[in-house]
């Protein structure tokens, strides 16, 4: 029986600088979503990569005295290593400088042109090099310093050039019909409302080529034009799915769910579906935009200089600690902030003092009192059954949450079980039962160890390394770690030899001057 396919993407990142924690956050969150669906039996294709063309890349390369391709090669390798460093389980890494991507871009361009949606004209307007976008004068402000800026603060300058245009204006009604018929096409709700408001206000035709730089995909039949970044960049999602070969096995993964930052929602929820409609290609399943991360409340930007290096953050706190903090602390889809204290408090409370402490205490007692094997399971009480049932119920809750990208809600459900298990363990007091009722002690220890097994299986998408270590300590075979194995049919078998217990979540201890 063929498994349900699930295609998940991050945006492709622009490598004119080094990765910051915002890039890492997108990969971590999308990775958790991908791992969750894999563990739930789906055939997942998870894509990330780099968007390597455009004026900024050309200018940065010129400043450094190297070619744009050399800059792209160097910096995309750093982004790829960031993806690995944050535990990304992506199936492919796409680069827009690949020959297959040129072929894909030119194919979609030709399809849109054949549909009558591309024409040549002149374009003039206020242009931001940083945003690689034109702005109406009404969208800009003139500062006291005499510099005109676009809404996000970068300088704009008046520019005029010949350009190919896409008839975006022809798609206003079709896009509104899409949002009405598929309310979940854009999420969360506030982003959907923003998109609908933007489209209802009227769509102008879109400039989709440039003559002012050469670093890009050539327009078919007119080499003095290169494709504008959004046709080029957005097309990566179908390039990786095999386009234009729509008969290939790879194409069966399309359509995708796109995870993006909220600053690029317009391009993914308006321009992209319009391009696909024009080209006769099926639309994405969903576009979900997460919020910004603020370092103690200030938005991170390479230009501001308060960017935190994700490699340094992981080295300092640990990979799973960083993953857990951002996935648990920040409601996915909303803005969030982080600080040294917030990371330490959350990870110490939930991981070191919570799940880690529960596993360490129960497994140490088993090693000491049960000969280092899974204890015997005696008669189960209602309390024993209830705590184990809660782990199964948490899977149901997590499935529902993750279907709507509610990563923080899934983790909250799982760690509610951990908190309840802590209370169960303290209330049953197996250390006291050792003297009064050793059989009951073994049943409590079995129940606690089995609970840790179930929770560890559920934690794998979020803290994969630590969850794997917990499952190793419980001697759970590698092929018995999917979500189907959370159920009682796959419970720990009494008498199974266990390795010597060891700590999985070291408690963060403050070092002088350690604040990140």
UniProtKB/Swiss-Prot annotation:
Catalytic activity: tRNA(Met) + L-methionine + ATP = L-methionyl-tRNA(Met) + AMP + diphosphate
Enzyme class, broadest EC rank: ligase
GO molecular function: ATP binding; methionine-tRNA ligase activity
Compartments where found: Cytoplasm
GO BP annotation list: methionyl-tRNA aminoacylation
InterPro entries (alphabetical): aa-tRNA-synth_I_CS (IPR001412), Anticodon_Met (IPR041872), Met-tRNA_synth (IPR014758), Met-tRNA_synth_2 (IPR023457), Methionyl/Leucyl_tRNA_Synth (IPR015413), MetRS_core (IPR033911), Rossmann-like_a/b/a_fold (IPR014729), tRNAsynth_Ia_anticodon-bd (IPR009080)
EC number(s) given by UniProt: 6.1.1.10
SUPFAM superfamilies: Anticodon-binding domain of a subclass of class I aminoacyl-tRNA synthetases, Nucleotidylyl transferase
Name recorded for this polypeptide: Methionine--tRNA ligase
Organism: Mesorhizobium japonicum (strain LMG 29417 / CECT 9101 / MAFF 303099)
Record lineage: Bacteria, Pseudomonadati, Pseudomonadota, Alphaproteobacteria, Hyphomicrobiales
Name of the gene: metG
């Amino acid at each position: 029986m063929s498994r349900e396919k699930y295609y998940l993407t991050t945006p492709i990142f622009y490598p004119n600088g080094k990765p910051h924690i915002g890039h890492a956050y997108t990969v971590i969150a999308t990775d958790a979503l991908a791992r969750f669906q894999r563990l739930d039996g789906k055939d997942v294709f998870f894509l990330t990569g780099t968007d390597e063309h455009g004026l900024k890349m050309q200018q940065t390369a010129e400043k450094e005295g190297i070619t744009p391709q050399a800059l792209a090669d160097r910096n995309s390798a750093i982004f790829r290593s960031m993806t690995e460093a944050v535990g990304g389980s992506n199936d492919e890494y796409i680069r827009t400088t690949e020959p297959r991507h040129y072929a894909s871009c030119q194919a979609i361009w030709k399809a849109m042109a054949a549909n009558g949606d591309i024409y040549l004209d002149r374009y003039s307007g206020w242009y931001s090099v940083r945003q690689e976008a034109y702005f109406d004068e009404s969208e800009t402000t003139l500062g006291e310093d005499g510099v005109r800026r676009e809404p996000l603060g970068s300088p704009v300058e008046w520019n005029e050039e010949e350009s190919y245009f896409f008839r975006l204006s022809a798609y206003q009604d079709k896009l509104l019909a899409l949002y009405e018929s598929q309310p979940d096409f854009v999420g969360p709700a506030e982003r959907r409302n923003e998109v609908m408001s933007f489209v209802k206000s009227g769509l102008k035709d879109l400039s989709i080529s440039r003559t002012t730089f050469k670093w890009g995909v050539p327009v078919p039949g007119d080499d003095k034009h290169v494709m504008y970044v959004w046709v080029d960049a957005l097309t990566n999602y179908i390039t990786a799915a095999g386009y234009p070969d729509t008969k290939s096995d790879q194409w069966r993964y399309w359509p995708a769910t796109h995870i993006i930052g909220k600053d690029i929602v317009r391009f993914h929820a308006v321009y992209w579906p319009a391009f696909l409609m024009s080209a006769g290609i099926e639309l994405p399943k969903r576009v979900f935009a997460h919020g910004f991360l603020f370092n103690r409340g200030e938005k991170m930007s390479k230009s501001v200089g308060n960017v935190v290096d994700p490699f340094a953050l992981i080295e300092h706190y640990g990979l799973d600690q960083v993953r857990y903090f951002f996935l648990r602390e920040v409601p996915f889809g909303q803005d969030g902030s982080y600080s040294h204290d917030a990371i330490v408090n959350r990870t110490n409370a939930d991981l070191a003092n919570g799940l880690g402490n529960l596993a360490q205490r129960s497994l140490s007692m088993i090693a000491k009192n049960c000969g280092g094997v899974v204890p015997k399971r005696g008669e189960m009480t209602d309390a024993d059954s209830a705590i184990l049932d809660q782990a199964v119920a948490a899977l149901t809750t997590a499935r529902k949450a993750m279907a709507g990208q509610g990563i923080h809600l899934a983790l909250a459900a799982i760690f509610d079980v951990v908190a309840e298990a802590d209370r169960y363990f303290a209330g049953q007091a197996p250390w006291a039962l050792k003297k009064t009722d050793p059989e009951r002690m073994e049943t409590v220890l079995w129940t606690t160890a089995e609970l840790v097994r179930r929770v560890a299986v559920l934690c794998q998408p979020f803290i994969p390394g630590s969850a794997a270590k917990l499952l190793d300590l419980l001697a759970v075979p590698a092929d018995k770690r999917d979500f189907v194995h959370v159920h009682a049919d796959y419970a720990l078998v009494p008498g199974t030899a266990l390795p010597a217990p060891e700590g999985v979540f070291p408690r963060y201890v403050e070092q002088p001057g350690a604040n990140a």
